[in-house]
Every structure is written in structure tokens, then in C-alpha cells.
């Protein structure tokens, strides 16, 4: 696996690089957004770890720009911003997960591995609920044969809901799909991801297909 680390602090960047390499992965380390763009385009990383406090471009702006350019690799954010509002902003920008500073490198590694597990391919199979179609091997959602650009976590939620078409899926079940490691789970993450997912779906399919069932969870149903 190739990991892109975007961090302006040289000591922290080096520490992350060494730890990730010791885990058996290839690492490109960038000190700013310009260098990150280069590695993204030239080396095609599998996942990016992005600090928000970059010298030439705010990390949130970088993530928004990547997502608007259809960059779909998983993004793990490093941030010193601890309020829930800041965390919502990070996820809304297109990040898949975040770690607040100061952090233990073991948590960064665990969250990175969790993201990659969610993003790994499955055996070739398609779930079709016209006009919705989920390609399990490509990890893609299509509506009316048009691919909808989703982040790794958004796709996982959508696949889980479609697999349970017509049945309520609890928030706990979705959290388990996203974070197999219990200590990494934060329930409000689901609400943010669900909001992003609904907006993307409604841009192509205006009818409401994901319903919140109060006190129970979420329901995907075509009417």
C-alpha cells in the first residue's frame, strides 16, 4: 500500500513516515499542498493522511479541491481542532476520518488500516435495485448508469443500506461496518456522513430513498 503523508512539521512527518514504512507500506511525504498535489498525480497513493495546518493552503481547502476533482482515495485528517463543530467541518469537506492532536501513532495506524479495510475490493458482484446499482468489486454506486462519486465511508454506508433494502439498519450496525475497532467509534460521524450521502443521491435522484427511523436507525427503500 502507498501512503501519502501531508504534514508541514518535519519531525512529525518523519516520525509518521518511519512508522508507516516499518508497517510494510510505501510512503510519500509532502510538506505542503503543492508537493501533495505532485505525489497525488504522479505516485497514485492508496490513502492520504492530511494535516489541516499547511503553509500554502488550508488542509480543508485541499480536501475540498481534491473531492471536487473526483479524487476518491480515503483521507485521514490530523487536526488540533477538538470541537464537534470542527470535526463536522472536516467530514463535510470530504475527509473519511480524523485524529486529534496530540495523538498516539498507534491510533493513526489503526484508523488508517480501518479505512483501507473499508476500501478494499470484494469479489465481482453487482447489487441492482433500478435505477440504483452497487458494484461490489469496484466499490461504486451508480444511479441511472451514472457513477456517483463517494468517499470510502459513504460507499460502505450505501452498500450496507442497499444490502438491507426495506429493512432498518441501526446506527450501531453502521458504526460496526465503518469502525470494527470499538475504541475508534464516534456516533455523530454517521450523521455527518449520512447528510453528505443524501445530498449526493438527491442530485441524481430527487426522491427520498434514505429515511431516518427515530430511535432505530436508517432505512433504504425505493417507493
UniProtKB/Swiss-Prot annotation:
Residues 2-116 form the Response regulatory domain. GO terms for biological process: regulation of DNA-templated transcription. CDD domains: REC_OmpR_EcPhoP-like (cd19934), trans_reg_C (cd00383). Its main location: cytoplasm. The keyword Lipid biosynthesis does not apply. Keywords: Activator, Cytoplasm, DNA-binding, Phosphoprotein, Repressor, Transcription, Transcription regulation, Two-component regulatory system. Phosphorylated by PhoQ. GO terms for cellular component: cytosol; protein-DNA complex. The keyword rRNA processing does not apply. InterPro entries: CheY-like_superfamily (IPR011006), OmpR/PhoB-type_DNA-bd (IPR001867), Sig_transdc_resp-reg_receiver (IPR001789), WalR-like (IPR039420), WH-like_DNA-bd_sf (IPR036388). The modification 4-aspartylphosphate is found at residue 51. It is found in: Cytoplasm. One of its GO terms (molecular function) is transcription cis-regulatory region binding. It comes from the Bacteria. Residues 124-222 bind DNA. Member of the two-component regulatory system PhoQ/PhoP involved in virulence, adaptation to low Mg(2+) environments and the control of acid resistance genes. NCBIfam families: PRK10816.1. This is Transcriptional regulatory protein PhoP. It comes from Escherichia coli O157:H7. The lineage of its organism: Bacteria, Pseudomonadati, Pseudomonadota, Gammaproteobacteria, Enterobacterales.
Amino acid at each position: 500500500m502507498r501512503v501519502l503523508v501531508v504534514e508541514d512539521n518535519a519531525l512529525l512527518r518523519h516520525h509518521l513516515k518511519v512508522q508507516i514504512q516499518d508497517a510494510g507500506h510505501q510512503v510519500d511525504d509532502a510538506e505542503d499542498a503543492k508537493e501533495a498535489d505532485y505525489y497525488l498525480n504522479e505516485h497514485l497513493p492508496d490513502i492520504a493522511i492530511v494535516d489541516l495546518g499547511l503553509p500554502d493552503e488550508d488542509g480543508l481547502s485541499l480536501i475540498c479541491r481534491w473531492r471536487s476533482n473526483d479524487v476518491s482515495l480515503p483521507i485521514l485528517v490530523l487536526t488540533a481542532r477538538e470541537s464537534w463543530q470542527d470535526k463536522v467541518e472536516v467530514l463535510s469537506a470530504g475527509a473519511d476520518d480524523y485524529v486529534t492532536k496530540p495523538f498516539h501513532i498507534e491510533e493513526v495506524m489503526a484508523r488508517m488500516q480501518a479505512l483501507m479495510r473499508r476500501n478494499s475490493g470484494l469479489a465481482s458482484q453487482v447489487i441492482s435495485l433500478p435505477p440504483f446499482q452497487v458494484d461490489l468489486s469496484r466499490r461504486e454506486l451508480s444511479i441511472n448508469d451514472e457513477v456517483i462519486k463517494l468517499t470510502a465511508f459513504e460507499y460502505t454506508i450505501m452498500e450496507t443500506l442497499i444490502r438491507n433494502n426495506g429493512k432498518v439498519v441501526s446506527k450501531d450496525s453502521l458504526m460496526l461496518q465503518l469502525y470494527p475497532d470499538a475504541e475508534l467509534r464516534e456516533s455523530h460521524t454517521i450523521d455527518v456522513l449520512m447528510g453528505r450521502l443524501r445530498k449526493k443521491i438527491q442530485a441524481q435522484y430527487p426522491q427520498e430513498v434514505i429515511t431516518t427511523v427515530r430511535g432505530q436507525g436508517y432505512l433504504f427503500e425505493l417507493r
